[in-house]
């Protein structure tokens, strides 16, 4: 429902509006209860997505302009669902003795604030703000992000730390639209969390201490969690936009991450909304001076590229650095082969022993990745170091001809 609502606003295609309405009405007309051991997470994460979809449709697809548009009955049924099905789960969580990692409480607060805004319920909203700042739980700003920027779940793994921090920024963004600044709370504590998360996941050393959490159950992590390290989710743009574009502050490590992953893609399941470059970025045109669909990449600079190289292993009982070759790749490059069928690569130092298909392109076909290996021996040589490949003649590993339509490639 949420993504169809966004697509409706962007494209103006009524099919997306009708699908969003169909989904919202189906839930509002049938959902009676949310239960299970993870019900606060379900009500928090999925509830936040659903109420945001309802918020968009309520004010952009109205019954006075569209026959199937949002009407008074939709408001009544949606509010009844949020108040009588979702909200009791959130209220129970707030009243229960703390028992979870912080991302649970943050997800609950994200949904409650969104419900309060949708239903014009000031108490729900203010209670969410109170919990965000002062709640007795791991899921509050001071209890989730330390002064150093370390996150309560940094020692657990990186995906949960990203989930929690992303939800905190969504709370701050909602409050900002209501005229309240939670971003600046505790001397820009949220910004410090982002910089710590970005810096540590980029491989830089950061200070780490064993966290004493509210529950006492999660106080035995003595190092940064390795799981998920360096796998950046789509949740950095929202905070970067506020602190850098709105406030003129600096987030150097977050900028490095965004240079690698822009434009941000979808969120992970329903954890965070994703597509932050589309939804939140308010800076200068990132494509200014570029021709749509034309690749213009500087291979000598690290921005956006990931590398694999040597590893440290035993050779004849001696620990040695061993390399089977160095590879580099960059994801989500916008390319349109129909307009630019040739790719020229300036590569002055290619070893004679390297495989001739050192340039490979890939994108998904029918939800599965396919790969196009371009033969350097068949490339047109310009001078000593420029190879010109014709992409539209290439066939994939499955025999598929490279598309001429705009697509994001690796």
What are these regions (language model features)?
Residues 1-179, 187:
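Aromatic-lined, polymer-binding surfaces characteristic
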Residues 396-410:
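Noncatalytic modules at the cell exterior or secretory-pathway interfaces
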Residues 178, 192, 214-291:
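Terminal, non-catalytic domain-edge segments
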Residues 317-399:
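Extracellular ligand-binding interfaces
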Residues 287-309:
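Extracellular carbohydrate-recognition regions
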Residues 310-315:
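Transition segment at domain starts
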Residues 47, 103, 109-110, 294, ...:
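Extracellular structured ligand-interaction cores
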Residues 151-231:
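Active-site/pore-lining binding-face segments in mid-to-C-terminal subdomains
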